[in-house]
Every structure is written in structure tokens, then in C-alpha cells.
Amino acid sequence: MKRHFETTRRIVIKVGTSSLVQTSGKINLSKIDHLAFVISSLMNRGMEVILVSSGAMGFGLDILKMDKRPQEISQQQAVSSVGQVAMMSLYSQIFSHYQTHVSQILLTRDVVVFPESLQNVTNSFESLLSMGILPIVNENDAVSVDEMDHKTKFGDNDRLSAVVAKITKADLLIMLSDIDGLFDKNPNIYDDAVLRSHVSEITDDIIKSAGGAGSKFGTGGMLSKIKSAQMVFDNNGQMILMNGANPRDILKVLDGHNIGTYFAQGK
């Protein structure tokens, strides 16, 4: 199926920790530079881009020379707080090589639930984009909680990216993953797994293949991505799920190349 993005102007790109931090725990500088080049190239074409970036914990562990994530929530939040500063500092440095200015927006769920604060953050996005600035969004891990009477966490940045796409009325959400897209079953286990090129509806079969009950596909956080795709559908949007190994593939996708899985209703 031919994909047409000629009229796409506003894009949300979500990048996960696995695309920013190597398995050794070291920061993947080359990958971040490639991503900065691609995003800057899109902005130079006149597109508006919002980057939703995980990685605060990974950066914090690297900075603090810690081998593994701490168990205590307060310590996790402290490490993420340190990592967020380091991550934004690196983003600012690398994007400056391409004359791209960046900003930071840290969100909690209550900000987008209450109408007044939602309007404020919406205005902030619009102002930044109108000024040609790249908003870099993450959850405010240092203060987010998930208590029954005061839930402020989004859950993960897959969901956050779908929320950002909704409130900014983005034309397209591009979700970079460590897998090529949505398969009919786990490709790490089954050699005959088939990549789904196009998904027009989130069916029970797709939910099962992505990690639901009785699934063959139990790893990789794919279910969270499918739930995010449903949120995109609910807002009449479209989404690409693709491998983030080579960020320059984003340019190919926008040129219509059949890369990853394209989530679009009735297309």
C-alpha cells in the first residue's frame, strides 16, 4: 500500500532508551547525532517536529556509574533527575551543530487532564513551533507518582507520545523502536513471523499478537505501542512504528518507502 505524506507538516517522533543508550550502558552518540541531523533536515524543509525522548534513567545510570536501576522509587527519581539534565545538555550541544534550537517540556498526566493547564501547555507547544524551536518532551520522572488517589504518571513514553500527538494535533506520530514494526508473532522466537505493513484497525488478534492474554509475543513492550496506536486512531491520526537503528530511515518513510508498520484507518 502506497503511503502518502506529501501534506504532512507536524510530526511527533518518539525515541526510546534502547535507541539512545547502548547495551553496555554507554550513550550512543552516533545515533543521537544521526537523529539530530534527520530532525533538523525536516525542520529545514518547513516541517514542525516534536521529539518525545526517553532515556533519563539510562543517562543517569551512566553519569552516576551505576550498573543497574535502583529499587527504591525515590532513588529512581533522583537518578532520572540527574539523567534528564545530562540528556538535555547533550541534545542541546548536538542539535546546535545543525543550528537547531531545542527546548524542554516535562509533563505529568495531571497537566493534560485539567483544562487550564492543558491550554497552557498547548500554548507553549504552539509558541515554540511557531518560533522554529524543537520541543523535547519527557515525563517529569522526578515528581511523577502512581498512587491510587493521585495518579500523575502516563505509564510510559509510548502513551505520552500519543498524548502529545493529540494535544498538538500532529499529522503523524513516528515511533522508533528496537524492532522493525508489528509482527503477527514474536520474530525473536518464530522464524516465520511476518511483518504487518499496514494496520487499519486494532483487532483482538492484533492485541494478542502484541502481548495480550494467550500471546506468543510477550516481550518488547509491543502492547503499549498498540494501545498508543489505538489512542492515535481515536483522534483520527496516523502512526508509523519502525526500527530506530538508522534514524535516516525516517526520511525514506516520509518519501513513501514501505518501512515499518503503518497505522492508518481506512487508508
From Swiss-Prot:
A GO molecular-function descriptor: glutamate 5-kinase activity
Alphabetical UniProt keywords: Amino-acid biosynthesis, ATP-binding, Cytoplasm, Kinase, Nucleotide-binding, Proline biosynthesis, Transferase
One Pfam family it belongs to: AA_kinase
Example of a GO biological process term: L-proline biosynthetic process
Superkingdom of origin organism: Bacteria
Residues at which substrate binds: S54, D141, N157
Subcellular localization, as worded in the UniProt entry: Cytoplasm
Function as written in the Swiss-Prot or TrEMBL entry: Catalyzes the transfer of a phosphate group to glutamate to form L-glutamate 5-phosphate.
Protein family per UniProt: Belongs to the glutamate 5-kinase family.
Protein's recorded name: Glutamate 5-kinase
